[in-house]
Amino acid sequence: MKCYATLVCVAAALPLFAAVETKTEKDVVYAPPERCRLDVKWPKGTTNFPTVVWFHGGGLVRGGKHFVRIDESIAQVAVNYRLLGTDGLTDGAECVRDAAAAVAWTLENIAKYGGDPKKVYVSGMSAGGYLTMMVGMAPQYLKERGHDIGELAGLAPVSGQATKHFNVRKFAGDTDPQFLPKIDALAPLAYCSKDIPPIISICGEEPWEWKCRSEENRLLISSCVALGHDKAWFVSCPFADHGRAFTAGVPYVEMFVQGRIPAALKVK
């Protein structure tokens, strides 16, 4: 009988950083809209390193690009994307298209910085976690950019909405209650499959976490496993609310990228 694995966040998971010298390039244009800019940070003096593409949170209506505190031997691409309600944008699919464009840019350009394009991971917090899942699970967005979700090394959404994002619904004119789950073409849950990249979904713990957030991510992971996926994990960070899921969860992004998810917890 298949089941999904749940990891417990503990102090031992906190990262230990070696001294690594890095370089940074800011405000790189990855698509024509003015907000479509990204920052790149990469380790000097080494090659073939992995890269995390990081999408910020903010409900798809606010926030800005930033790096996260992980081992600096891992490159980071921090992304700005267009926001709903800004410059008349009301279609949530356009936010996903921006995210896909940034991932495509990374696949096409990270080798110029010394990175391995076969080691590109996608991650993000909250709205950024939603974008992570949409880009990495819904194949049409990367296909529009000439790429395939199979090119990604892994997905690590942190407290992302697995149903249709509440602000995507709001700006589309949906007036139903926020916590009434909707699953359609703009919901990651619609794309559960054994064929998506390796995925680790990281959330806070109910009842502290955002309502329904942990439960719907558990459903996403368990559905992928039931469909035959053998590299899918769910992480529950004890006592963490939505904000603390970020600080408690980022170390697991690092563990995932470095292949340090304990073998005993791999999905069977």
Residues covered by each model-derived region:
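The feature captures the conserved acid-bearing segment of alpha/beta-hydrolase catalytic domains
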Residues: 146-168, 179-222
